[in-house]
Swiss-Prot record:
It comes from the Bacteria. Its cofactor is thiamine diphosphate. Homodimer. Part of the 2-oxoglutarate dehydrogenase (OGDH) complex composed of E1 (2-oxoglutarate dehydrogenase), E2 (dihydrolipoamide succinyltransferase) and E3 (dihydrolipoamide dehydrogenase); the complex contains multiple copies of the three enzymatic components (E1, E2 and E3). It comes from Geobacillus sp. (strain WCH70). This is 2-oxoglutarate dehydrogenase E1 component. SUPFAM superfamilies: Thiamin diphosphate-binding fold (THDP-binding) (SSF52518). The gene is odhA. Its EC number is 1.2.4.2. The lineage of its organism: Bacteria, Bacillati, Bacillota, Bacilli, Bacillales.
Length: 952
């Protein structure tokens, strides 16, 4: 075989796509004039002959090999140019076929075929007939006999009811796998007649359900699926693959559009239960054994199209799989990272020390997006960015864009700057399939390809399901007023069930009478279910109080640890491998921790934290901590991950505790707040036994995730009964660093505090931090569990007055309030009680150490702000019979911090005729001064006012 005959040798394997086309053009030029090309190319052509096509390099089938052995590239420049053109045409069809595809069920978009016309490449059908199939479409089925057949085959595949975009996928193995699957038709379902009838039955159930709701509950919001009915069989197909592959958990996130239909038909929520929610009747009687979620009794509940559900399925091997539809607020797309967190938690085994073991095949996420929200909401890009990061990847998610080509009343030309709703995914190299929702079999094909790709490559996949919205945004909306052109077409357009039924009738697969009987059966089932729902609303009790265990205080949890245990753990945490080179300065800092259990110094904040973590792991509670720069700590205080200064190798001391009984991980998060916090919330919901902590770089940046605090963390239990023990660490304190590096917006968390929905604390000592972390770990699996919002310090991290003696760890516990030592000892003389919290308490303590004659003053630190320590403060006030004023002192402006929250509570419990007043910054629009000099003067003024006795 000469070099001119086809072979698989280098160097041509490094060329593909447009680059290969260029090299083939150069070869054509070389045949005419060898000296007209670059000397390097000339040498390659001389040595290796004609460039090999991608087809040759990646198809090793017997027929293709035979072609390569028998076909010799022509040296005639004209014939060779036709081959080059044919290869280019095939490539253009793969890249641009989607522009000409029949993917819009309303046919309202012009198809662009310019890039894939034969005339554009100076080709004729006769030219193509002379070219072997393998050069154009090596994966073509047997009926494709020549180049013309191959081009027609590619046109059919790439411009039909399903279209593909994968040129953004840079990995050659992935691209060629996609080409193989698509062009061979391997992914497309070959349904039996029985399966086609079953598919029609499913579409009949989907449509019948919506029509029944429309007739029965006139004008009530339901956000129907109509126009995207095929989404349900598409989900069915993904679920079928999952149970066959013995996946353990499938987690679904979606907004309101079509949610009730998915709840009924994918999650198995009984019709009766859904109808009861429309009827405002009791729905508890219809709770299935699988555990579908209804309105949560004892709380405020949520609207029916926000509720989630869970269902368990079994396959023939008795393998059980759990399907979960996440509870969801109306805030579009914000559930996405929550569902990813669910999935990572479901994939991991946290029962052993070290890093959790992860099995990405055991669970995956399906995210259903809106076509306006997918490009419009920034949380989408944030979440996509998590998909391949070590601390967040889940082995790929399947995204379905429920594309009805409109957002409320806004059409696509006003809602995005891209051609497709899915285009943002291209930046993450995610393959995209556009599919016409009026072709249910094509929708199943898209599901097959997505599942197979995710399984093989552990990466995300996007299905752009293009349909329409048969009615308005909700059932009280009239779309003809704002979108008359689109809706005049929709009103005349048959439903997907009607289209598919007609197709099966025409093929003789089913009779018209059988179709009508199918409709009657579905309608009868719905009617019977509706008749079971009670109609009398008068029996319902609308007084909804939280359950008693939650309404009460947190239970006592022993958080002190024996000194010998702490001493041993401390020693183990300071042991490194003999060949590990710790950074010199850091090594000196860590060495200081060695002597604290021998009376040499105190335990500072970061030291208390790592000891708390070590003891929690010893108790068998897994820990997951994430945040921006959290491994080291924003303020270089933590150092949970050490780096060898010669090799860069990492060492995590908490992985080497001798009696650790659970996993520990700490990840530096991407520069994202909302998606990461949502992810950690989701992780904690699915792994309730795990102490999950999220740390803001500065508390000021937590408001980038405000939607997560508002819609999930503070209210998730009241709306959905969804428990969480998530810990949020928000660095807070005024140190002259300006308005964006001073405030964790404490006031916002206190404003949201109600029904014991979380604990809000602002601590002043390392021991308090130790105990509150251990208390939180101790309540994780109790009914009283709740999130913990901690205003963490910056300047206190190394402050000697915030450090704690060993005895406070071995004999102490968490105290909601702490009285200032050395003050208030002469009870008769105390006239002023100052209440304060957090870092400002240390500012006052520092100044007090320089003063004398303070027997008229007492200072009380309120460490736990919510729940408010009413009884503890009342007991303190009662000890001082001559107190004249109770002052709340803070460094935050009057309209921020704790004052607005504590004022009415203090007035309620203050002794009669005792004035309650405020000292701090005046009301401000911005949290803090930008000038450090101005800050210092203002800070000094507040401290002086607080510590200066009033003149008589």
């Amino acid at each position: 075989m000469t070099k001119q005959t086809m072979n698989y040798a280098e160097p041509w394997s490094q060329f593909y796509g447009p680059n290969l086309g260029y090299v083939m053009e150069m070869y054509e030029q070389y045949l005419e004039d060898p000296d007209s090309v670059d000397p390097e190319l000339k040498q390659l052509f001389k040595e290796w002959g004609a460039p090999t096509t991608e087809a040759e390099r990646f198809d090793h089938s017997e027929s293709a090999a035979k072609t390569y052995q028998t076909f010799r590239l022509p040296e005639n420049p004209t014939i060779f140019s036709k081959l080059v053109a044919a290869v280019k045409l095939a490539d253009k069809i793969r890249h641009y076929g989607h522009l000409a595809a029949d993917i819009n069920p309303l046919n309202t978009q012009n198809k662009d075929t310019r890039r894939i016309e034969l005339s554009e490449f100076d080709l004729t059908e006769d030219d193509l007939k002379q070219i072997p199939v393998a050069f154009i479409c090596p994966h073509a089925p047997a009926h494709v006999k020549n180049g013309l057949d191959a081009i027609n085959h590619l046109r059919k595949i790439y411009t039909d009811k399903i279209a593909f975009e994968f040129s953004q996928v840079h990995n050659l193995e992935e691209r060629n796998w996609l080409i193989s699957q698509i062009e061979s038709g391997a992914y497309y379902p070959s349904l039996t007649n029985e399966e086609k009838v079953a598919l029609l039955r499913r579409l009949t159930e989907v449509e019948g359900f919506e029509k029944f709701l429309h007739r029965t509950f006139v004008g009530q919001k339901r956000f129907s699926i109509e126009g995207l009915d095929s989404m349900v069989p598409l989900l069915d197909e993904l679920i079928r693959h999952s149970i066959e592959e013995e996946v353990k958990a499938v987690n679904i996130g979606m907004a309101h559009r079509g949610r009730l239909n998915v709840l009924a038909h994918v999650l198995g929520k009984p019709y009766e239960m859904i109808f009861a929610e429309f009827q405002h009747a009791e729905s508890k009687d219809f709770m299935p054994s699988e555990g579908s979620v209804a309105i949560t009794y004892g709380w405020t509940g949520d609207v029916k199209y926000h509720l989630g559900a869970a269902r368990r399925l079994r396959n023939k091997n008795e393998h059980t799989m759990r399907i979960t539809l996440a509870n969801n607020p109306s805030h579009l797309e914000v559930v996405n990272p929550v569902v990813l967190g669910f999935t990572r938690a479901a994939q991991e085994d946290r029962s052993n020390a070290g890093v959790p073991s992860q099995d990405t095949d055991s669970a995956f996420a399906i995210m259903i997006h809106g076509d306006a929200a997918f490009p419009g909401q920034g949380i989408v890009a944030e979440t996509l960015n998590l998909s391949r990061l070590q601390g967040y990847q889940t082995g790929g998610s399947i995204h379905i864009i429920a594309n009805n080509m409109i957002g409320f009343t806004t059409e696509s030309y006003d809602s995005r700057s891209t051609k497709y709703a899915s285009d943002i995914a291209k930046g993450f190299e995610i393959p995209i399939v556009h599919v016409n929702a009026d072709d249910p079999e094509a929708c199943l094909a898209a599901a097959n390809l997505a599942f197979a790709y995710r399984k093989r490559f552990k990466k995300d996949f996007v299905i752009d399901l293009i349909g329409y919205r048969r009615f308005g945004h909700n059932e009280m909306d009239e779309p003809m007023a704002t979108n008359p052109t689109m809706y005049s077409i929709i009103q005349q357009h048959p439903t997907v069930r009607q289209l598919y039924a007609q197709k099966l009738i025409e093929k003789g697969i089913i009779t018209k009478e059988a179709v009508e009987e199918m409709e009657r059966e579905v309608a009868e089932r719905l009617k019977i279910a509706y008749e079971k729902v009670p109609k009398d609303e008068s029996k319902l009790d609308f007084i909804m109080d939280p359950p008693k265990p939650v309404a009460s205080k947190l239970p006592f949890v022993k958080t002190s640890v024996e000194k010998d245990v702490l001493r041993r753990l401390n020693k183990e945490l300071l042991q490194f491998p003999s060949d590990f080179h710790v950074f010199n300065k850091l090594e000196r800092i860590l060495k200081r921790r060695e002597g604290v259990f021998d009376g040499k110094g105190k335990i500072d904040w970061a030291h208390a934290e790592i000891l708390a973590f070590a003891t929690i792991l010893r108790d068998g509670v897994p820990i997951r901590l994430t945040g921006q720069d959290s491994q080291r700590g924003t303020f270089a205080q933590r150092h949970l991950v050490l780096h060898d200064m010669k090799t860069g190798e990492e060492f995590v001391p908490l992985h080497h505790i001798s009696d650790a009984n659970a996993s520990f991980v700490v990840y530096n998060s991407p520069l994202t707040e909302a998606a990461v916090l949502g992810y950690e919330y989701g992780y904690n919901v699915f792994a309730p036994e795990t102490l999950v902590l999220w740390e803001a770089q500065f508390g000021d940046f937590a408001n980038m995730a405000q939607v997560m605090f508002d819609q999930f963390i503070s209210s998730g239990r009241a709306k959905w009964g969804q428990k969480s023990g998530l810990v949020m660490l928000l660095p807070h304190g005024y140190e002259g660093q300006g308005p964006e590096h001073s405030s964790g917006r404490l006031e916002r968390f206190l404003q949201l505090a109600a029904e014991n929905n979380w604990t809000v604390a602002n601590l002043s000592t390392a021991a308090q931090y130790f105990h509150i972390l251990r208390r939180q770990a101790g309540i994780l699996q109790r009914e009283e569990v709740r999130p913990l919002v901690l205003m963490t310090p910056k300047s206190l991290l190394r402050h000697p007055l915030a450090a704690s003696d060993v005895e406070e760890f071995t004999n102490g516990q968490f105290h909601p309030v702490i009285e200032q030592k050395g003050l208030g000892e002469n009870r008769e003389k105390v006239e002023r009680i100052i209440l304060c919290t957090g870092k400002f308490a240390i500012d006052l303590a520092e100044q007090i150490n320089k003063m004398e004659g303070l027997d008229w003053l007492h200072i009380v630190r309120v460490e736990e702000l919510y729940p408010f320590p009413k009884e503890e403060l009342q007991a303190i006030f009662a000890r001082y019979p001559n107190v004249k004023e109770i002052i709340w002192a803070q460094e935050e402006p009057k309209n921020m911090g704790s004052w607005c929250y504590v004022e009415p509570k203090l007035r309620e419990i203050a002794p009669d005729e005792v004035d309650v007043s405020y000292i701090g910054r005046r009301r401000r629009a911005s949290p803090a001064e930008g000038d450090p000099v101005v800050h210092r003067k203002e800070q000094e003024r507040i401290i002086q006012c607080a510590l200066t006795k009033k003149e008589q």
